[in-house]
């Protein structure tokens, strides 16, 4: 009997481990649980999640894998039904990001592999925050720059500065400024029908077109970000507007959080654009600080601390 590989809705990549080593007879299990379609959940969030999962299932089928895409009231029910029908030798999955989810899948007998969607293994993060005095995001970020060799000339930062905070903390221009339109892709008829079905029971407007649903969307959005949006990012990265919701932000976090983009490929694309003269150094540094610094810093503490951490301050 084949093994099965369970994929969650925030793990939508075939380019990370263990995909390159999966046998062609591995059954890919994707479970759409009922809580995803139960109110109250924002319409755009719910529709985006489901459309991305369904598109991923089609992509995996096109690669020759057998896909068991099923609806269930819970993961426990879905996994039990899959075991009864497929009788896999093993069900494995990349490590889920939530503690409760990890505990649940362990109880359900699923083998948890490492999480390949971040750049910093837990042991590395633990070492970083226990050896640095004080353990601040800035010291961690500089360590990341060296470890990942991002914007470095040997052991020194490109431009001989670790940050460009002075340049990157400007207020909005008088009058609010003019900003590049955000990336978008119109919904297909099939996608629109799925959104319409959800609209009756989910609050909020339909903004799904502004977010990627497929790997192709995510790559297109990444190209758009590095060529059209990020050149304007740095000076106003900390500014906020009451009339413009996107300013010059890349909005790539959704693609990364769904697994449609890996943070390393985002970093490499932005560095390549800087090397081509497309993005100023201050904007490049300010953006990469978010990806290899803040994103990894927050994720590391989430792994390292238990739930009591939320009430410490």
Where in the sequence are the language-model features?
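Glycine/tryptophan-enriched, flexible segments
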Residues: 148-287
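Short helix/loop capping segments that flank catalytic or ligand/cofactor-binding pockets
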Residues: 15-17, 38-39, 234, 264-266, ...
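Short His-Asn-centered micro-motif
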Residues: 6-10, 31-32, 70-73, 93-96, ...
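Flexible loop/turn segments at secondary-structure boundaries
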Residues: 13-15, 36-38, 76-77, 100, ...
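N-terminal beta-strand-loop-alpha-helix module at the start
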Residues: 1-70
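Beta-rich, aromatic/charged-enriched effector core domains that present basic-aromatic interfaces
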Residues: 75-211
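Active-site cradle of extracellular carbohydrate-active enzymes
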Residues: 285, 290, 295-313
């Amino acid at each position: 009997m084949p093994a099965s590989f369970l994929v969650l809705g925030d793990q939508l990549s075939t380019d990370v481990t263990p995909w390159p080593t999966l046998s062609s007879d591995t059954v890919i299990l994707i479970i759409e649980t009922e809580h995803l379609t139960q109110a109250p959940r924002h319409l755009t969030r719910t529709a985006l999640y489901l459309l991305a999962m369904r598109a991923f299932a089609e992509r995996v089928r096109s690669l020759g894998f057998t896909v068991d895409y099923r609806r269930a009231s819970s993961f426990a029910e879905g996994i039990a039904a899959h075991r009864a029908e497929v009788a896999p030798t093993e069900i494995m999955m990349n490590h889920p990001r939530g503690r409760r989810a990890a505990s649940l899948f362990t109880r359900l007998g699923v083998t948890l592999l490492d999480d390949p969607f971040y750049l910093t293994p837990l042991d590395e993060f633990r070492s970083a925050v226990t050896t640095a005095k004080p353990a601040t995001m800035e010291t961690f970020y500089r360590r990341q720059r060296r470890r990942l060799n991002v914007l470095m000339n040997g052991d020194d930062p490109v431009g001989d500065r670790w940050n460009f905070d002075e340049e990157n903390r400007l207020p909005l221009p008088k009058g609010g400024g003019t900003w590049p339109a955000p990336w978008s892709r119109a919904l297909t008829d099939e996608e629109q029908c799925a959104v319409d079905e959800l609209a009756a029971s989910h609050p909020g407007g339909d903004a799904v077109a502004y977010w990627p649903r497929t790997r192709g969307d995510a790559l297109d959005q990444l190209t758009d970000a590095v060529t059209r949006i990020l050149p304007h990012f740095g000076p106003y990265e900390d500014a906020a507007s009451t009339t413009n919701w996107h300013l010059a932000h890349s909005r790539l976090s959704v693609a990364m959080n769904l697994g449609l983009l890996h943070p390393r490929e985002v970093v490499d694309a932005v560095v390549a654009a800087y090397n081509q003269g497309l993005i100023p150094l201050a904007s490049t540094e300010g953006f990469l600080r978010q990806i290899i610094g803040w994103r990894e810093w927050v994720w590391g503490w989430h792994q390292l601390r238990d739930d009591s951490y939320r009430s410490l301050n």
